[in-house]
Amino acid sequence: MRGKKFVAAAVLFAATTSIRAQDLVTYHIDHAATQGLKGLRNIRNHLDVDPTAKITVVTHAQGVDMLFVDAKGEGGIEYAPLVAALRARGVEFEVCEITLKNRDLKKTQFIQEAGFTPSGVVRLAKLQKQGAAYIKP
């Protein structure tokens, strides 16, 4: 019986270790004009070095603007293709619904890669509680 408990504990430890082997990372964007392109570039570089990282981008306030349909950054660079390429690599993009309400925005104004969260700030806190690294470009 004692041997079975040891094996069960070893299996649980191995499973926990393999889960934690994947880095959890949160990118916080609250101003698209100054953080949007820089953040997307950082995320691309992050995944180029560590393709197993699980990355979530949480946007609120003016940060949600980068996920609008037809949104463009500095130099007229379109955000949508950059976001789509990162989404294809497993990156999650989330828009704060409180921002939608406060700015009278509709979900239909956002690209299809955008997901939604009731509160960007609460989502950031929960991701950090789960052990995600916090990066603000």
PLM-predicted stretches and their roles:
Residues M1-V7:
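Bacterial N-terminal signal peptides that target proteins for export
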Residues A8-A15:
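Bacterial N-terminal signal peptides
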Residues T17-A21:
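Sec/Tat signal peptide C-region and signal peptidase I cleavage site
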Residues Q22-D30, T59-F68:
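Acidic/histidine-rich, surface-exposed loop or edge segments in extracytoplasmic proteins
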Residues Q22-L24, P51-I55, A88-E92, Q130-A133:
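Loop/turn elements at helix/coil->beta-strand transitions in domains of secreted/extracellular proteins
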Residues D30-V57:
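N-terminal targeting signals for Sec/Tat export/insertion, comprising classic cleavable signal peptides
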Residues A61-F110:
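Mid-chain, structured segments of secreted extracytoplasmic proteins
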Residues Q112-P137:
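C-terminal partner/receptor-binding element of secreted or periplasmic proteins
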